[in-house]
Amino acid sequence: MAREYKIEDYRNFGIMAHIDAGKTTTTERILYYTGKSHKIGEVHDGAATMDWMEQEQERGITITTAATTTFWKGRDGKMRRFNIIDTPGHVDFTIEVERSLRVLDGAIALLDANAGVEPQTETVWRQAEKYNVPRMIFCNKMDKTGADFYRSVEMIKTRLGATAVVMQLPIGAETEFKGVIDLIEMNALIWRDESLGAQWDVVEIPDDLKAKADEYREKLIETVVEIDEEAMEDYLNGIMPDNDKIRALVRRGTIDVKFLPMFCGTAFKNKGVQPLLDAVVDYLPSPLDIPAIKGIDFKTEAEIERHADDSEPLSMLAFKIMNDPFVGSLTFARIYSGKLEKGTSVINTVKDKREAVGRMLQMHSNSREDIEEAFAGDIVALAGHKETTTGDTLCDPLKPVILERMEFPEPVIQIAIEPKTKGDQEKMGLALNRRAAEDPSFRVKTDEESGQTYYAGMGELHLDILVDRMRREFKVEATVGAPQVAYRETITRHDEEDYTHKKQSGGTGQFARVKIIFEPNPEGEDFKFESKIVGGAVPKEYIPGVQKGIESVLSSGPLAGFPMLGVKATLIDGAYHDVDSSVLAFEIASRACFREAAKKAGAQLLEPMMKVEVVTPEDYVGDVIGDLNSRRGQIQGQESRGITIVISAHVPLANMFKYVDNLRSMSQGRAQYSMTFDHYSPVPSNVAQEIQAKYSGQK
């Protein structure tokens, strides 16, 4: 079967935003207008097509990224293929956003017209910047009380440091919002309410908005001609670009991430969605417009590129593992190059294992269609892959490549969990391991001494939902302990240790001597190992054993057994024995050497500090600040946002549990907050003593 749509007619994009900015509703409208849904699903009814897990429908938030394929006829009458990924906006699910941005070519960033740029918008924005994802902005909820399009434009500049190119102006706002002015065509689009937004009238720009439309069209042209010398020269000579030229320049600037085209509307009231779909075609990249993906040759380790071309060797990236109640385990993958056929096999180059391509599916939210083959640019779901986990590369066994791996954040909160009955024990193990395979920001560990199982994640909601899914999907009843903070330890001083490991007990003995300098790593929180051995005091083949030995004890620090951060180790000398030395002997020696050093190098306890943002009416500002200070918070600043005040602070995670209940009672339910992990910070000594006393008893 040949390719149905040319690769230049593909648009792989995601919809990203703060929680409650209307992502799922916007996606629902897109599916409705592109003909994939016969009725519009509303989030507040629990009927949205993309929110298919039970908890999502109950809580009205999107938890897992649902992928869907749909089609849209552009302004030129040509059909385009859209692969859309709906991403969660709650900060506990940031990992889902990170995964989807990694495999997308473009994104629509949604803003709530009332709130503008919110904390999670900034978090998601930073992730999109990291992967250099071209974006457009849709200022949603223009019908909401307090909606202010122009404030949102300003916030994009001040809070995101980005340049928004305004493509439309709103006609009216709040309950008076009727439609938009198209600044390229210079006409107005007014939607007919009775048609569920399917029909609109193109009319003259209202007289009271003509001057504003002229002003913003001028700004639009000024911004876009800057990226093209010829267009700039013409403009300075009084020659204006025509509409096609403006669109071409907007497309180029968007793909090069020089600026962001900005649109407005209200998805809930069905206004502004179709022009947004036309803009996806006009301005977001096809797989051909983005740079070829880089990878490492599996055999030679040389850097190679894979282009978006069916004739190139197959390469794809697994970006999500999901358990489907009907199909079983599903691996979602983005095909970057080549062609994938049912019945063939691929190699997982990260695990060095072969996987058979059995059932291959194209997904529409939670319904599915079996397909026989897929091509470069496609997003597919593969059934029954046993070895593959998130971030793995799958490719042609004859031309193996390892694509760039994804980076995942460390969990900041952990909870002790115990099955209620012996029969639940095995099921719980299976459930936790499956969750860990699906979600790399979730970790499971068992304390060797106490036998207690802990699981760690990105926040209370993240862990609540995991327990809930375990109960629903695996029928496991478990007792859950109070949340615990994922503390870390580090060293603050330089220490040099000389350690000899010697064991003689008949037969082959063990011998290894290491001299190592331990100090804080000036480059950050990672572990850094360096060898300055000259003259073969420690043979080259034993040096990896030294590194491995130190790494094996970094998981349990000297103060309270927490993992260690920010350590640098430099091997400067050592000795070996021709017969008795081995990699294992050097591993044992370096392990003991580090344990000695950790006691003397000024070990320090670190705690996760959260960036907290509270949005509150002015009446409660004093109470909110006083409360944050009492939680060991450091106020970073405050600013006005409409009729509310936004307070920013860094607060230890340990002092933020159940904060939402306090904030509600303090503000009579009128204040809201959000928090994201910011950095690790030393724990004050009086608090550190309490923590050590509490955890040393458990370890």
Curated annotation (Swiss-Prot):
Gene Ontology terms: biological process: ribosome disassembly
GO MF assignments: GTP binding; GTPase activity; translation elongation factor activity
Binding site for GTP: 17-24, 86-90, 140-143
NAD in keyword set: no
SUPFAM superfamilies (alphabetical): EF-G C-terminal domain-like (SSF54980), P-loop containing nucleoside triphosphate hydrolases (SSF52540), Ribosomal protein S5 domain 2-like (SSF54211), Translation proteins (SSF50447)
Annotated Gene Ontology cellular component terms: cytoplasm
Location (main, coarse): cytoplasm
Record-linked InterPro entries: EF-G-like_DII, EFG_II, EFG_III, EFG_III/V, EFG_IV, EFG_V, EFG_V-like, G_TR_CS
Cell compartments where the protein resides: Cytoplasm
The keyword Nucleotide-binding is assigned to this record: yes
tr-type G domain residues: 8-288
Keywords: Cytoplasm, Elongation factor, GTP-binding, Nucleotide-binding, Protein biosynthesis
HAMAP family hit by this protein: EF_G_EF_2_B (MF_00054_B)
NCBIfam families with a match to the protein in the record: EF-G, PRK12740.1-5, small_GTP
Family in the record: Belongs to the TRAFAC class translation factor GTPase superfamily. Classic translation factor GTPase family. EF-G/EF-2 subfamily.
Role description: Catalyzes the GTP-dependent ribosomal translocation step during translation elongation. During this step, the ribosome changes from the pre-translocational (PRE) to the post-translocational (POST) state as the newly formed A-site-bound peptidyl-tRNA and P-site-bound deacylated tRNA move to the P and E sites, respectively. Catalyzes the coordinated movement of the two tRNA molecules, the mRNA and conformational changes in the ribosome.
Family matches, as PANTHER family: RIBOSOME-RELEASING FACTOR 2, MITOCHONDRIAL, TRANSLATION ELONGATION FACTOR G-RELATED
The protein, known as: Elongation factor G
Organism: Rhizobium radiobacter
Gene assigned in the entry: fusA
